Amino acid sequence: MTTTVKRRARIGIMGGTFDPIHNGHLVAGSEVADRFDLDLVVYVPTGQPWQKANKKVSPAEDRYLMTVIATASNPRFMVSRVDIDRGGDTYTIDTLQDLSKQYPDAQLYFITGADALAQIVTWRDWEKTFELAHFVGVTRPGYELDGNIIPEMHQDRVSLVDIPAMAISSTDCRERSSEERPVWYLVPDGVVQYIAKRQLYRPEGSDKDMDPKGQNQA
């Protein structure tokens, strides 16, 4: 009689400001899920990103709702409020500790941009994060992570995945929206409508209503 051993669940964790979430984030989640045979990808909007303490960031609820809208059509995607509800500055170590408690039997894969991964030694309790997850750096084709950045003892816990759509950036999407230039096909359709409805990313002092139909113009 053959005994089937059930493998541990594999869960991707993608943390980010998502201001706004764009198609590059979604393609990255899908590609990493396929590459590592993930059962689920959890998108985690930050509460207060510590790296952006002096920068203007959209309200957490707006960023959360845009992420929910963007991921709703993919049954392998879900959104967690764990960082928002915790309050205070968001640190990856806290995210991973909280989610490892929610999924105690799962193998976690933390998905982040390779440029952010290159700064990992500046993160709070960064060495402990390797005990909780395998790190996946998503990047544009041709990018190479400096081998000296990640200590040798942790290099087997890091993988890079090329994502062509990572050329899209949230910064560019915000700038285009503030100038009333189209962001269709850069962010999901529902997010385009949400940005227009909530009048996000308008210039300071602007009292001009954004025209959601204008986002249709090429």
From Swiss-Prot:
Pfam families reported for this sequence: CTP_transf_like (PF01467)
Q: Which cysteines are joined by disulfide bonds?
A: none
E.C. number(s) listed in UniProt: 2.7.7.18
List the InterPro entries hit by this protein, alphabetically.
Answer: Cyt_trans-like, NadD/NMNAT, Rossmann-like_a/b/a_fold
Query: Would you kindly state one Gene Ontology biological process term found in this protein's UniProt entry?
Result: NAD biosynthetic process
Q: Provide the family line.
A: Belongs to the NadD family.
Q: What is this protein called?
A: Probable nicotinate-nucleotide adenylyltransferase
Q: Which gene encodes it?
A: nadD
